[in-house]
């Protein structure tokens, strides 16, 4: 989709928010200043005087998501928020009590306003005992050649993490920076944090291989997602510690994915796939990965592209037909019937119930299930060239070539078309921080099929099942995207592993966590990098805080 845009313009607010600001300006925001409370984790929540547990004024429920009207301060749950605005004309804008985010009752959607964020972040800094700048300095927009950042809140402040980590924040690895939630955009922030710290992508953008100042699309005023990502990478590695608002990238992605252009909660995995597709298209490459025996050279496929092998074997004559398909991620089935939910784990821990480790799903089990031999049903008979007719057959997947970066997607969301129902699988999944993918390679799978005999494999030499693992099959984890909560109203958080330590990236909030916290989360997307890539990144990327005058460091991959 070709479009000319202003690159320094945030997405427009909805009409209801615009009408509210015409009538009340920002006075309504400021009137809530005495209700905002800064808690120990640096989050801002609304605390009503004399009310310990807020409840919906219509049904008295307190366990659902609650919203407080900006005009009358009436509290409504998610089931009655629309009713409130229907009964009270003009009462369209409310605040999420738990997350202190703006919500439009008429649009049934979260909305973003930088002036509201200014009030909230000012309260955060005040609660953390830090100085707050005023006037134009508070939301000044920088136009530095290296960083064209917008919506910067409280520039020059020291806010990044909770009070527990404040004294140590400057020892955090370079690139750790919070991302503001622009209205149910945690799905985007979670993926961006993982991609920003992926060594090949970090190397690509910080070394100027896609320079927004030289991009022909950008100079013509056209949309270019790689240019927007260039801005993101420059901002994240600038040394600035204030939370950053990726509004330009969100707007640009909306233009490319018009069906997803909404402030409603989206799926992180869908965003990941969509973003990589848009990067591929914007770099002007062919959509076909393999054409005339040449692989696509865009950064998306250089980093994430692997090759799957599919063997379909006739159960009558034993002949095998082989096909190859490229992939940029692998989706794994999570067997919820044999797994523990978070509540089960807590219950069994104290009641002496069955061992959690005994029946908890594991990543190796999911990969075994993915590469198992599967008998196709009678309605899936395929034409066997040897038999000359349709025969029943079996199918087995394996990995012919591994990518530099391996993304494993855990299928937690189930949608039934026949029953018209959807549900989320909350089972825990055990996964290693170091992963050996050798057992799932085509060489290993075929070796087992033929009794681990030595044989010629694809004309590329002899395969010996006893040979040691290839270094390229050893992977180390560097990011985990998690999903917590219900299907429609959950929340995405990313855990990053940098220099052997783990950091929790929850929108604008970043803090260091213990390894056990990461192992106990509900993983949704697992990002691994080849061990050699991680080792080279550790050697060549400096984690010292740099000023804007310094050159950006980068790591070869």
Swiss-Prot record:
Catalytic residue positions: 186, 491
EC number of this enzyme: 3.4.19.12
Pfam families: UCH, zf-UBP
Positions that bind Zn(2+) 2: 69, 72, 84, 91
Compartments, record wording: Nucleus, Nucleoplasm
Keywords: Hydrolase, Metal-binding, Nucleus, Protease, Thiol protease, Ubl conjugation pathway, Zinc, Zinc-finger
Chief location category: nucleus
GO cellular component, one term: SAGA-type complex
Top-level taxon of the source organism: Eukaryota
Zn finger (UBP-type) start-end: 36-130
Enzyme class: hydrolase
Reactions performed catalytically: Thiol-dependent hydrolysis of ester, thioester, amide, peptide and isopeptide bonds formed by the C-terminal Gly of ubiquitin (a 76-residue protein attached to proteins as an intracellular targeting signal)
Known role: Component of a deubiquitination module (DUB module) that specifically deubiquinates monoubiquinated histone H2B (H2Bub). Does not seem to be a component of the TREX-2 complex. Seems to act independently of the SAGA multiprotein complex. The DUB module is responsible for the major H2Bub deubiquitinase activity in Arabidopsis.
Family statement: Belongs to the peptidase C19 family.
Subunit relationships: Component of a deubiquitination module (DUB module) formed by ENY2, SGF11, and UBP22 in Arabidopsis. Interacts directly with SGF11, but not with ENY2.
Protein name per the record: Ubiquitin C-terminal hydrolase 22
Provenance organism: Arabidopsis thaliana
Taxonomic classification: Eukaryota, Viridiplantae, Streptophyta, Embryophyta, Tracheophyta
Gene from which this protein is expressed: UBP22
């Amino acid at each position: 989709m070709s479009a000319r845009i202003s690159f320094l313009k945030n997405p427009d607010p909805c009409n209801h928010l615009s009408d509210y600001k015409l009538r009340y300006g920002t006075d309504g925001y400021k009137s809530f200043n005495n209700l905002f409370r800064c808690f120990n984790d640096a989050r801002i929540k609304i605390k009503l005087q004399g009310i310990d547990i807020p409840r919906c004024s219509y049904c008295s429920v307190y366990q659902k998501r609650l919203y407080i009207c900006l005009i009358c301060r009436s509290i409504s749950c998610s089931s009655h928020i629309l009713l409130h605005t229907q009964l009270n004309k003009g009462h369209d804008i409310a605040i999420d009590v738990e997350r202190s985010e703006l919500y439009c009752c008429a649009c049934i959607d979260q909305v973003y306003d930088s002036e509201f964020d200014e009030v909230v972040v000012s309260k955060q800094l005040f609660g953390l005992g830090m100085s707050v700048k005023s006037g134009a300095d508070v939301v000044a927009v920088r136009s530095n050649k290296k960083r064209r950042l917008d919506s910067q809140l409280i520039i020059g402040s020291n806010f990044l993490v909770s009070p527990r980590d404040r004294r140590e924040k400057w020892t955090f690895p370079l690139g750790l920076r919070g991302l503001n939630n622009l209205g149910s955009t945690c799905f985007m922030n979670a993926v961006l944090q993982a991609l920003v710290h992926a060594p090949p992508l970090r190397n690509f953008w910080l070394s100027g291989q896609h320079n927004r100042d030289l991009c022909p699309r950008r100079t013509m005023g056209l949309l270019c997602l790689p240019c927007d990502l260039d801005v993101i990478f420059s901002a994240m590695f600038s040394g600035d510690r204030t939370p950053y608002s990726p509004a330009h990238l969100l707007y640009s992605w909306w233009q490319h994915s018009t069906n997803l252009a909404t402030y409603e909660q989206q799926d992180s995995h869908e965003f990941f796939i969509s973003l990589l597709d848009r990067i591929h298209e914007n770099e002007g490459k062919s959509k076909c990965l393999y054409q005339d025996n040449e692989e696509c050279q865009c950064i998306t496929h250089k980093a994430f592209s692997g090759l799957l092998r599919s063997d379909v074997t006739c159960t009558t004559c034993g002949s095998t037909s082989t096909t190859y398909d490229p992939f940029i991620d692998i989706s794994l089935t999570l067997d919820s019937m044999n797994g523990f939910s978070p509540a089960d784990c807590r219950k069994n821990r104290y009641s002496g119930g069955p061992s959690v480790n005994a029946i908890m799903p594991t990543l190796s089990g999911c990969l075994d299930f993915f590469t198992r031999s599967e008998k196709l049903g009678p309605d899936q008979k395929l034409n066997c060239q040897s038999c000359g007719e349709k025969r029943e057959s079996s199918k087995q997947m394996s990995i012919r070539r591994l990518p530099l970066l391996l993304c494993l997607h855990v299928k937690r969301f189930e949608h039934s078309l026949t029953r018209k129902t959807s549900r989320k699988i909350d089972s825990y999944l055990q996964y290693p921080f170091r992963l050996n993918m050798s057992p799932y390679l085509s060489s290993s799978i075929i070796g087992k099929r033929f009794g681990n005999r030595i044989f010629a494999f694809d004309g590329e030499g002899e395969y010996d099942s006893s040979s040691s693992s290839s270094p390229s099959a050893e992977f180390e984890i560097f990011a985990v995207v998690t999903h917590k909560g219900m299907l429609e109203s959950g929340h995405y958080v990313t855990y990053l592993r940098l220099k052997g330590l783990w950091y929790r990236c929850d929108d604008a909030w970043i803090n260091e966590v213990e390894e056990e916290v990461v192992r106990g989360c509900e993983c949704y997307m697992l990002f691994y990098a080849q061990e050699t890539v991680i080792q080279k990144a550790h050697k060549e990327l400096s984690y010292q805080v740099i000023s804007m005058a310094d050159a950006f460091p980068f790591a070869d991959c």
